[in-house]
């Protein structure tokens, strides 16, 4: 069975700094972790948050405002395809969707 966790972090940097982020992987061992409201820019992510051993990570950032919205997807298995957005410019520019296609399923991490 595939174990999927979804979490609205309301700020990934703060969540990680408080020590809540990386222990999640050890405790629950999710196959897929979907994060909403990451509120980070690519250059603000520490390596230990971006690169979790045994996981692929994919981030969708807001192009309109720094530190606003954003979603992320961590997967144990490398996806066949990763996609960003839903074809609606306003939402796509806010970094609200990241998805991945696997052999047996597709997962979409998003929020509004």
Regions found by a protein language model. Give the residues of each.
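Structured beta-strand-rich core segments of catalytic domains in phosphoester-bond hydrolases
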Residues: 39, 47-112
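N-terminal, active-site-proximal structural segment of metallo-dependent hydrolase catalytic domains
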Residues: 1-52, 63-68
């Amino acid at each position: 069975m595939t174990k999927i966790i979804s979490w609205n972090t309301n700020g990934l940097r703060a969540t990680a700094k408080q020590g809540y982020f990386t222990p999640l992987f050890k405790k629950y061992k999710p196959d897929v972790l979907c994060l909403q409201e990451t509120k980070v820019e690519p250059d603000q992510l520490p390596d230990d948050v971006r690169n979790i051993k045994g996981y692929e990570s994919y981030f969708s950032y807001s192009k309109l405002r720094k530190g606003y919205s954003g979603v992320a997807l961590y997967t144990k298995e490398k996806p066949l395809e990763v996609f960003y957005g839903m074809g609606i410019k306003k939402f796509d520019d806010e970094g609200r969707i990241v998805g991945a296609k696997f052999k047996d399923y597709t997962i979409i991490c998003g929020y509004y």
